[in-house]
Structures are given as C-alpha cells and as structure tokens.
Amino acid sequence: MTDKKIFIAVVGESHASPEIAKLAEEVGAEIAKAGAVLVCGGLKGVMEATSKGAKSAGGTTIGILPGSRREDANPYIDFPIITGIGYARNKLVVKTGHVVIAVGGSHGTLSEIAFALGYKIPVVGLKTWQFIHHNGQMDQEVHRASSPKEAVALAMKLAREAKPPEETREYKT
C-alpha cells in the first residue's frame, strides 16, 4: 500500500435496526478520523448511517448507486456514482475498497462479502455473517471485530498490508 488515501468499503443491510445503525454510524466516524475515504452503496440503512458518521467527523463519502438517479443517494454522500446496473453494483462497491467492513447484513451483504473474498480483498466483520466450511471448521477469512473502533483499526492495518490492487482484482474461486 502506498501513501495514497485508503478507501474502505462498508457493506450492510438497507433496513438496519437501531443497534446496527448506531454501530455503522460509529464506523463511519472512525473511518473519517483515520483519514480514509468511505465507499458504500449510497442508499439507506447501514449505507446512510455510515455516511452520516463519516460526514460528522469531516470525512469524504462515495456512494456507488444501483440506479441512474443521483437524487437517490442518501444526503451524506459527497460523490454519488450512478451505474444503472442494479445490484450488480455490489461488485463495484467491493472492488473500489482496499478493504471491506461488513456491518450487520442481509443477503446483499452476503454477496458483497463473497465477492470480496473471491477478489482477495480483506474483510472485517462487525455483527455480520459467520461462515462454516463443509468440514465444520469456522472460516478465518473474515476478520472479526467487536467494536467500530476495532473494526476500522483492523481495516486500516489490513489495507496497509494488502497487496497492490492490480495483484488482487482477478476473481479467484
């Protein structure tokens, strides 16, 4: 990783509970305090809460939208990127990040975690999906965090240690 800005993609459910929304907002604030750029899907739920937190701490936010209208972005997005490709944009959210933080999550979040793991992009999980291999062993690829501060600190560490993006962006099965 170079001295350039670190981009942290945050993924999570679009209908977040108050508990998950609070965690997401704290994650956003920690991302801004760390000097990283927040990348998300730009809509509601975890995406909006994280963006709100980042903006409250003076951060920069990028929202990669599934539709074709900038107006659909939540009010805390600085740079709405319209795609018109629906939820296929989940790949773009993940690939834009040097690291992914999953906060809570539903099935869309599950797809984003899977894309990140396939692209060898580090994933930090905060109250999100857990994976068990067919042999019954717990998967160790998703790094677990117990707080927003720990999640962002771990994400920053993993991003700095990660291989350059050009070496990790081909999907591996």
Describe the residue ranges of each PLM region:
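Glycine-rich beta-alpha loop segments
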Residues: 1-62
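C-terminal binding/interaction regions
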Residues: 2-6, 11-15, 87-159
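Thr-Gly-centered strand-to-loop micro-motif
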Residues: 41, 83, 102-104
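Short, ordered loop/turn segments at secondary-structure junctions
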Residues: 43-44, 66-69, 128-131
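Short, hinge-like loop/turn segments at secondary-structure boundaries
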Residues: 56-59, 78-82, 120, 141-144
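Short, hydrophobic beta-strand segments that form beta-sheet elements in well-ordered domains
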Residues: 60-65, 123-127
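Glycine-rich oxoanion-binding loops at beta->alpha junctions
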Residues: 64-100
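A short, charged, Gly/Pro-tolerant segment at domain boundaries
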Residues: 167-173
